[in-house]
Amino acid sequence: MATGRRKANRTKKEETNWQERVIQIRRVSKVVKGGKKLSFRAIVVVGNERGQVGVGVGKASDVIGAVKKGVADGKKHLIDIPITKSNSIPHPIDGVGGGAKVMMRPAAPGTGVIAGGAVRTVLELAGVRNVLAKQLGSNNPLNNARAAVNALSTLRTLAEVAEDRGIAIEKLYI
C-alpha cells in the first residue's frame, strides 16, 4: 500500500508544473425535441513554459466541467518545441488552422512576446519569451490557437536539419 501512496505523490508533483489558461468560454445550445439544451464550451491552453504546449476543447453542462475536460484534452495533444538560448524560436515559421493563418518570426533578447490573443497565450505557455507573431485571416480564438500549435510543431533545430540531410552541422551553411 505504501508504494501506491508514493506513486500518487509523484504524479501530483509532476502535474504542478503545468499551467493552464482559458482562452474562451462560450455558451452553446443544442436543439432537442423538448427545446434547447444549453452547455458550455471551453478552449484551454496547457503548457509547462519549458517547450511543451497543447490546446484543448471541453464541453460540459457547467463551466468547471468544461474547463476540466479542456485541460485533459490539452494534455492529450501536447507538442514539444525547440527553444533557442535567447528564449526564441529557431527560424521563421507559418501555421494554418481552419481559416486562420499565423506568422511567427524569431526576435532578439529583450523584445518580449509581440502577439495577440490566443497566439500570445500559446507562445507564453510554451516558454517562448522573444518572438514576433501576426494573426492573419480569421480572428476565431480556437482556429488561431490551433494555427499557432501547427506552426510550432513544424519547428526544427539545426541539428535536426543536418541529420535529415546527412551532413555535419558545420557544413550546413557552407
From Swiss-Prot:
Domain S5 DRBM: from-to ranges: 18-81
Keywords: Ribonucleoprotein, Ribosomal protein, RNA-binding, rRNA-binding
Entry's Gene Ontology cellular component terms: small ribosomal subunit
InterPro entries, alphabetized: Ribosomal_Su5_D2-typ_SF (IPR020568), Ribosomal_uS5 (IPR000851), Ribosomal_uS5_bac-type (IPR005712), Ribosomal_uS5_C (IPR005324), Ribosomal_uS5_N (IPR013810), Ribosomal_uS5_N_CS (IPR018192), Ribsml_uS5_D2-typ_fold_subgr (IPR014721)
A GO molecular-function descriptor: rRNA binding
Function: With S4 and S12 plays an important role in translational accuracy.
Description of its domains: The N-terminal domain interacts with the head of the 30S subunit; the C-terminal domain interacts with the body and contacts protein S4. The interaction surface between S4 and S5 is involved in control of translational fidelity.
Protein name (record): Small ribosomal subunit protein uS5
